[in-house]
Amino acid sequence: MARPSFQLDIVSPERQLYSGRVVSLTAPGVQGGFGVRARHAPMVAAIGAGQLAYTEAESGRTLSLAVGGGVVQVIAGSVTVLAEITPP
């Protein structure tokens, strides 16, 4: 049985960095880290500097990006991250 997933879009000021189905997202919230899974309650949260990690629904791979701050919006089966990306 497939794990519940949601659409994730990660956008920086320069370009779209990721768009796809994921089963989880963890983010460095400004008041502490938080996680999002399918059917999460709607919310908007500020994120600080740290690692944004997500697990792809199809491959099961966990990927991450270093972010310098931004905003996460969760609405009806979709999550949008607007973030400044920190160079490696």
Q: Can you name each region flagged by the protein language model?
A:
Residues M1-S5:
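Short, charged, intrinsically disordered terminal tails
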